[in-house]
């Protein structure tokens, strides 16, 4: 169950990033995190903090709730 949430969240982050035609490196720079961290989130290898969820939503120009949808 826990992993399912991380997988779905990571997929949403990746979908939004690709919609904006951003590489992981470009996106990481905008969000203020390391590129490998973005990769780990997208692959559901990292349990993300609320602070970093906020950074990611801001960098993607979406609401935090958009990243969670119906998780």
Predicted segment positions?
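Short, conserved catalytic or interaction motifs in soluble domains
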Residues: 43, 62, 69
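Short basic helix-loop element that most often maps to the first helix and adjoining turn
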Residues: 11-26
């Amino acid at each position: 169950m826990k992993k399912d949430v991380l997988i779905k969240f990571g997929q949403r982050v990746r979908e939004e990033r690709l919609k904006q035609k951003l590489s992981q490196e470009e996106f990481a720079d905008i969000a203020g995190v390391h590129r490998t961290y973005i990769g780990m989130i997208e692959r559901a290898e990292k349990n993300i903090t609320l602070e970093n969820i906020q950074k990611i939503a801001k960098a993607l120009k979406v609401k935090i709730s958009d990243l969670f949808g119906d998780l």
